[in-house]
Amino acid sequence: MIRVISLFLVFVSLASANIFDFLNNNFAGRGQQQGGQVQTPEQYENAILNTNCGKYVCPDTGMCVEAPKFCPCPYPSSQLRCFLPDGRYLCISKPAGDISAKYDDPKSNWKVDAKDDNIRDCGWVSRAWRGLV
């Protein structure tokens, strides 16, 4: 009987440790960025506005580029930059699965069109823009 109670207490303590670790990681650290720096929207805005850039500062990444069309996506390893007919662009998640290797080259991945409305790539964005989806 004592052995059963001991095992029960061990399992309860392990479960509660995991729960508190989960709560601490997901709720106590809210609002913190990687590296432990907390940045409010006002601080972010000031950092972007005070960037030493003579060209164009991308609002999503803070990078200095020649023109808005050269702004990279915030997460280039998992996003495609799709150009719209009006010259703007938007970033979408790269398609997954068997077709995903086609989208690995950032210089050409925006040109790939699977021609399948079930695969959301830049071709799909273009068709959606024209009202064909």
UniProtKB/Swiss-Prot annotation:
Signal peptide: 1-17
Function: Probable component of the endoplasmic reticulum-associated degradation (ERAD) pathway.
Keyword Signal: yes
Record flagged with keyword Signal: yes
UniProt superkingdom: Eukaryota
UniProt source species: Scheffersomyces stipitis (strain ATCC 58785 / CBS 6054 / NBRC 10063 / NRRL Y-11545)
UniProt name for this protein: Long chronological lifespan protein 2
Gene Ontology BP annotations: ERAD pathway
Keywords associated with the record: Signal
Family: Belongs to the LCL2 family.
